[in-house]
């Protein structure tokens, strides 16, 4: 089963992904987390479910790749994030991707591994931006994808809804 979680920035997509990854067995992949200095967001970390960390983007990073005010670190994205997805593809039942967004899509290797996991029989839970990017649209428009939109009203109930759908689907496979 392929599950996409979308919603406006700051609504809680990463929080939901982290809760799901703790509750579900045999999961691999990564999530992103804000980096702050005081009240100011200065970048994003990439953290694998195995605990490996790297820098996805920072405001002061020497990089030719930029999204808004953030300079994207393709090296850590590919060596930590992409590698965690490849490892999860080989070893796990469930693959977590937070997120399929502008920064991550700068990497050809990231796009290739996302296509590979979505074309596989593996269960996938990913967060995805509301975007008009052709790659994002291709993923969203797949027949095997279920999209959940997270908002303030369903923030507390969506966790159980996704768990129920996933467990029901896994039960049908057996």
Swiss-Prot record:
UniProt record similarity statement: Belongs to the THEP1 NTPase family.
Role noted for this protein: Has nucleotide phosphatase activity towards ATP, GTP, CTP, TTP and UTP. May hydrolyze nucleoside diphosphates with lower efficiency.
EC number(s) stated in the UniProt entry for this protein: 3.6.1.15
Catalytic activity as recorded in UniProt: a ribonucleoside 5'-triphosphate + H2O = a ribonucleoside 5'-diphosphate + phosphate + H(+)
Organism: Thermotoga maritima (strain ATCC 43589 / DSM 3109 / JCM 10099 / NBRC 100826 / MSB8)
SMART domains: AAA (SM00382)
Class of this enzyme: hydrolase
Protein name in the entry: Nucleoside-triphosphatase THEP1
Keyword Hydrolase in record: yes
Pfam families, per database record: NTPase_1 (PF03266)
GO molecular function list: ATP binding; ATP hydrolysis activity
